Amino acid sequence: YTDIKWGIWIWVLAGVAGILCHAPQCSLSDYYRQIHLFFLKGREGSELDNYKQQRAVYDSLSLRHAPFQKIFYYNDANYCKGQERRTPRFQAFFQLIKERFNGAENLPVKIKEHFLKGSRPLMKYTNILTFNTRAISLYASCLLNIPWLYLLVEITIMSCIYIYMHKCHELLCEECIQLVTEKELIQQ
């Protein structure tokens, strides 16, 4: 219980923290983790989905016979679309390796190792941006009787981590694109 009179500002703060910060951060963290697992363990060791694949499943379902599955795949397809839209360099890299090597499974070891070496340090940030750190921050701010502090942590600290992680991953993908194109030049 608190004697603070919450005005409209707390709802604005919560909306910004939840919709503009938390949701995109978790989405991209999940995507980067699945990408890392895909390059580490292959398709079987990852849940790396894409918009076209999920949309095809959605289109194949009947609203009448499978309403919950249809709703699920509609949301999942849009979730994937949002992840793909925010990762243009990864999308270019992934498309390039599909074209040149017929998929990541046939990627030369040097390029795969370079990607994993650059991706591995980013996994700590994906972990920070998922549930545990947020839960601890929320519980601590509530126990200290300053629950609005959690919202500020979400908007400031977590957003800075998200921006850094995103920038590093896109730069890594650009490096990998350069490695693929250099390898092509050497082979010609």
List PLM regions with ranges.
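Multi-pass membrane catalytic core of lipid/isoprenoid biosynthesis enzymes
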Residues: Y1-C26, L138, L143
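C-terminal membrane-associated helical module and adjoining short loops/tails
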Residues: C21-H22, Y31-Q188
